[in-house]
Amino acid sequence: MEDDPLFCSPLLAEADFLACQADANELLDLAQIDSQRLAASENYPVLKMRKLHSALRQRQLLLPLWLLSWNTLTGDTRDTNGRFFRGALLMDNLLGLADQVWLAGFWLNSGLQGEAGANGKLDTSSLALHYLHGLPRPVYWVLWLWRRLRGEVVINEKNLLLLRDNGHYQLLLRNTVVFNPWLSSEEAFIQRFSQPWSVRLLGLDGRWRIKHHLFDRHHGALFPLFEAFRSQSGPDEEEYRWLMHQARPALRVSEETPASDRWQLVDSLESNALALYEFTPLNDMK
């Protein structure tokens, strides 16, 4: 990247920003994928932005990066793209990009994006927020969950993020997995990536309202719902309204008084699933 002629151009010193793209799929040929390239694709957009910043610093330039188009690993056909659920993969990259870029671009919908290509292949170089009839695609809900996050970081590990904000807490769990999207229809293969969790939070005295948002293949993913309406004519307006209602993360709310001020979670997450727990002390609700 440092050898790119752009970084030797005197025009760069006059620039107000640097526009760029980062598509993890440009690393891969799904027909002959190898484990090393697959692993490198996991955080490719974030790593590419870091390299750009490094190249700019070497030339004593501080330019905001505008990430106009980007994508994580995904399938290159309608079926493999739809079946390859990647909520956690998208969230990991959003969290990593937040302090690397000034803006990240999205298409409003897949029609404007021009996603469908020739021979049944998809253009995987960018992301669209919606599908047909305004149906939310997975990245829409990942952004929705990401925008809920606020406060200071208490713990930030690979698959766990704990935030604190004026006595409120948020716990974000991710089961980030990369594998060949062509294998997304192999249920036995997918199940091997399920991840058990055991988390204990201390110091939660009193009574709390706990909201649990779950986003996985069965709670919020659009493609499995769409499959129920596969026909030559496609869904009608009533069915589109039903899809709009169903294609969202699950929400469960409880009120708990943790024993000995300790709250414990024992659960499991499917491949690339996301779970966000939000803790609100009930004395704040008065």
Model-flagged regions — what are they?
Residues 1-100, 104:
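Noncatalytic carbohydrate-binding groove/subsite architecture in carbohydrate-active enzymes
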Residues 7-8, 163, 200-205:
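Extracellular and analogous surface-interaction loops
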Residues 18, 97, 143, 212, ...:
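Conserved, mostly hydrophobic/aromatic
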Residues 24, 110, 281-283:
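Flexible, active-site-proximal loop/turn residues at the rims of small-molecule/cofactor binding pockets
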Residues 26, 104-113, 215-228:
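Short, solvent-exposed beta-strand-terminating loops
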Residues 45, 49, 90, 136-140, ...:
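A structural signal for well-ordered alpha-helical scaffolds and beta->alpha junctions
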Residues 67-187:
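Aromatic/acidic polysaccharide-binding cleft in carbohydrate-active enzymes
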Residues 174-286:
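C-terminal beta-sandwich/jelly-roll accessory domains of carbohydrate-active enzymes
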